[in-house]
Structures are given as structure tokens and as C-alpha cells.
């Protein structure tokens, strides 16, 4: 897809009403350092440094859709417990409609606790129910769909085999969707795909496709046999088999097959990557994008998702940033922090080393240029944090800056060595550094390593600080003094 088409797709997302049906859960993360062995047993001891609870399961599909700009509703059953309440409040805070979520006092809301050290999971602890929901709750969800269905452009089914998606409920949901010509995209679980019969598209991974088809996938021929069998078994329009580092394969009812290669990336965590694929495919099909282009976008998004730790979302900026589109002009390099954060995540997912530096850069001169060129040499992507006019005044005095922030940003963005410019209003760039997490932090040689703001942050995750010597006699102050000497008396 061309850039303008991808941008148009995401711009249209705000007009899409998506319904997510499936198993909701909470994902809890305990982050820390595992550097000791317990004296009580031969196990690691985790020193917890951070705790976080996120919406997971089918809820992460909803999260991704919200991040993509869609209007989202959820239909499910949760327990009448504290975790269920936390889920509902979290959804409401994101603007997700939960009128299709029903509470069962006899049910336990799923909560998965993941213990993470050095960006790797050590252990997972599950607390949940797996019993099928009762007929009464099936009827409530179907009733909600019949009442509200006319407003939905797409239905996404996220099955984690936790009991919400019974065969009876699935058959009823797919039947209503087909009556109303609403595409149904399913992330399946289990070996019996007949329960998804009549859906538009299924997205099993390779292992799931092997189990459901009964065919060991060893080469392209066996892959195609498995795809064809699943298409027929579930009466699908299309099937996408995700194949990890081998990309994706799309199978169409008319016999067409499209293999989509992946791109090199570092995999930190596959948790939630399938949710991201489902969300992108759902949005694309709701917008009328063809299956091949939709799968291509989903492949890019999956590559971003596995570069993050835990159940995370993927933004339009990340997808666009990962598709290799070139800057059309220097203005395209100037970003706000929210937009840049997504782009940098995408650059990291592609294996790029991020370099960060900052400054006022008032009256750009050769010393600045040589400094920035040297900074770029330490990595692949150079991000420049630019002090705003207000920030410069606080640091340099009321007569500065001489050049306003918009012009300074545009001039700097015109340099080939700079990839992105982000303006910040604080006295220091600490918030930018904490958000972007560069691999290399560069400052001028007039600093000591201990005096560099953000040094502790960067070194905490294995990054480093580089000090670059300035060109002698080249500074904005010297230029101002020279101008005043030459023209001050006129």
C-alpha cells in the first residue's frame, strides 16, 4: 500500500464501530531484577521494582482498536469480583462501551501474573475460570448483538478457551453477522474449527493450524494443504496463518495464496501479538481494504508488537514508521512526543540503534553541525530534543532565543544527520529520555558524565553516554559578540 492509502485508512478509523467478543482478563506484570538465589530453595529471587496491571485477552484487542482510533464496544462475561470491576473501570476510562459485558457472581475473572526480569518472563501465575458460560449469558450477549448490531462495521472474536465463546454463542453471533453482512474476524483456539463455521477470516498461528488441520507443516506444500483444509472446514472467505519469523500466509476461498515475508526484528515478548494482528485485520476489512493489503499491514504491526514487552498496543504512527516510507520534506521529521514515541518503538523493532541529544541550537553554526554529525555516527537514528522558546528564556535569559522554536526546528530538520526533532518545554530533557529510552545519549564535551541529565536512566537498561568535543571558538555567544562588535555602533 502507498503511504497516502495507509494514512487514509487510519484517518477513517474514527468512523469505524468495532465489536469485540471474547474472553476478558487482566494481565499483571511484576518487573524487577533477578540477581540472587533463594536460601530456601534453588529458585531465583525477584527484587520487584515496578508493578503494572493491563487489560488482556480479548480486552487487548479492544485496546489495540482504541489505539488505532476506532470506536469500540465489548461483549463478554466477567466475574462479580474485584478483577471484574477493575476491568470495567479500565474500559470506561478508555471510552470503550461495556454495555455488552455481563457479570456472573459465580465466575472468576481471569488474572494472569507475569514475573519479568531483564525483559524476559520468569514465571506466569494464572487465576481464572474455564467453565462455559450458562445459556442465560449466551442469550444476553446475542440479545445485545441483535439490538445493537446495526451500528457495527466489524466483529472481532478473540477466543482464549476460557468459557465465554461456547459453540452455541459462536454459531448465533456468526449467523447474525452474516444476516447483516458484517465481517467476522476470529483469533481461534482449540482444534475444532467447525465452531467458527461461516466466519469471514481466521488467524491461527502455525502450531494452531497444524493441530486444527491435522497436517504437520514442514514445507510450502504441506502449508498449503493445511490452509485449504481449514478454509473448507470452517467455510471461510479467507485464512491467515501467522508463521513467526517466516511472516504470514494468506489463503483465499478462490484458491489464491499470498506469502508475506517478515522483516528482521528483535523479539522480546510474543504476548498479545495475535491481538494486534486481529485488530489491524478487523480495521482494514471494515474500511474495505483487500485481504492481501490487510494481511500486509497486520504483518508489519505484529513485528512491532513482538518488539515490546507484555500486552501492548500498536499505533498508526508505528505502523507507518515501520513501512519504510521516506520523509517527504524536513517538516515530516518534526514530531510531538506522543507521535515520536510510537515511531521510535517501530525503529527499535526494526533493529535500529537510537541516539538522543538535546540543546537550544540558537543560531546554528559549524560547531553545531559537526557535533550533530558525530552524534549520528553512534547509531542509526538521531533524535534531537529542542528546547522551546520558553525553556531557552529560562536558561539563557529574556533576550534569547534569537530564532523562534518553529524556525529552529525546521532548520535542524533540514540536516541529513537528524532523523527526528521533538520540542520540549521543560528545563531538562529527562521526560523525553525516559519515554524514548535511547541506546546512546550524547552531550557536549563541556559536561562531565556525572552531570549529564538522563545518564542514570540510560545506563539502567544498558545504554551509554558519549561526550563530544566542540569545535574551538565556535558558539552562538561568540557569533552574537562578533555581530555586536561589527554593527553595535550603527
Curated annotation (Swiss-Prot):
PANTHER family: BIFUNCTIONAL PROTEIN HLDE. One of its GO terms (molecular function) is phosphotransferase activity, alcohol group as acceptor. Disulfide bonds: none annotated. This is Bifunctional protein HldE. The gene is hldE. The active site is at residue 275. GO terms for cellular component: cytosol. It is an enzyme of class 2 (transferase). ATP binds at residues 205-208.
Amino acid at each position: 500500500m502507498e503511504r497516502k492509502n495507509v494514512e487514509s485508512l487510519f484517518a477513517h478509523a474514527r468512523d469505524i464501530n468495532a465489536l469485540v467478543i471474547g474472553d476478558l482478563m487482566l494481565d499483571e506484570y511484576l518487573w524487577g531484577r533477578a540477581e540472587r538465589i533463594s536460601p530456601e530453595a534453588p529458585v531465583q529471587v525477584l527484587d520487584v521494582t515496578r508493578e503494572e496491571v493491563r487489560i488482556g485477552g480479548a480486552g487487548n484487542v479492544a485496546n489495540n482498536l482504541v489505539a488505532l482510533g476506532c470506536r469500540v464496544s465489548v461483549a463478554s462475561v466477567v466475574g462479580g469480583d474485584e478483577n471484574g470491576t477493575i476491568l470495567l473501570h479500565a474500559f470506561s476510562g478508555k471510552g470503550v462501551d461495556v454495555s455488552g459485558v455481563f457479570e456472573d457472581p459465580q465466575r472468576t475473572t481471569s488474572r494472569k501474573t507475569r514475573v519479568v526480569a531483564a525483559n524476559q518472563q520468569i514465571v506466569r501465575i494464572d487465576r481464572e475460570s474455564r467453565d462455559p458460560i450458562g445459556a442465560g449469558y449466551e442469550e444476553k450477549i446475542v440479545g445485545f448483538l441483535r439490538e445493537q448490531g446495526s451500528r457495527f462495521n466489524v466483529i472481532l472474536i478473540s477466543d482464549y478457551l476460557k468459557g465465554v465463546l461456547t459453540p452455541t454463542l459462536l454459531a448465533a453471533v456468526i449467523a447474525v453477522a452474516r444476516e447483516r453482512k458484517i465481517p467476522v474476524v476470529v483469533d481461534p483456539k482449540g482444534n475444532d474449527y467447525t465452531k467458527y463455521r461461516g466466519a469471514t477470516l481466521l488467524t491461527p498461528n502455525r502450531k494452531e493450524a497444524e493441530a486444527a488441520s491435522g497436517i504437520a507443516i514442514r514445507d510450502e506444500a504441506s502449508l498449503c494443504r493445511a490452509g485449504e483444509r481449514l478454509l473448507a472446514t470452517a467455510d471461510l472467505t479467507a485464512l491467515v496463518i501467522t508463521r513467526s519469523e517466516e511472516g504470514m500466509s494468506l489463503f483465499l476461498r478462490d484458491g489464491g495464496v499470498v506469502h508475506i515475508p517478515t522483516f528482521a526484528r528483535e523479539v522480546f515478548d510474543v504476548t498479545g501479538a495475535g491481538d494486534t494482528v486481529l485488530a489491524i485485520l478487523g480495521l482494514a476489512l471494515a474500511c474495505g481494504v483487500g485481504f492481501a493489503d490487510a494481511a500486509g499491514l497486520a504483518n508489519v504491526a505484529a513485528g512491532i508488537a513482538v518488539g515490546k514487552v507484555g500486552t501492548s498496543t500498536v499505533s498508526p504512527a508505528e505502523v507507518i514508521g515501520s513501512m519504510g516510507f521516506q520523509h517527504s520534506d524536513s517538516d515530516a521529521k518534526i514530531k510531538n512526543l506522543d507521535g515520536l514515541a510510537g515511531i521510535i518503538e517501530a525503529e527499535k523493532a526494526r533493529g535500529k540503534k537510537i541516539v538522543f541529544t538535546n540543546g537550544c541550537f540558537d543560531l546554528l553554526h559549524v560547531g553545531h553541525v559537526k557535533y550533530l554529525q558525530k552524534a549520528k555516527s553512534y547509531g542509526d537514528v538521531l533524535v534531537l530534543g529542542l528546547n522551546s522558546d520558553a525553556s531557552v528564556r529560562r536558561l539563557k535569559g529574556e533576550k534569547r532565543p534569537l530564532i523562534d522554536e518553529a524556525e529552529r526546528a525546521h532548520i535542524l530538520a533540514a540536516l541529513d544527520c537528524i532523523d527526528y526533532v521533538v520540542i520540549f518545554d521543560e528545563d531538562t530533557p529527562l521526560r523525553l529520555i525516559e519515554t524514548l529510552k535511547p541506546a546512546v545519549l550524547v552531550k557536549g564535551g563541556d559536561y562531565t558524565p556525572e552531570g549529564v541529565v538522563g545518564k542514570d536512566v540510560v545506563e539502567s537498561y544498558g545504554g551509554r553516554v558519549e561526550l563530544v568535543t566542540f569545535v574551538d571558538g565556535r558558539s552562538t555567544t561568540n557569533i552574537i559578540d562578533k555581530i555586536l562588535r561589527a554593527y553595535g555602533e550603527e
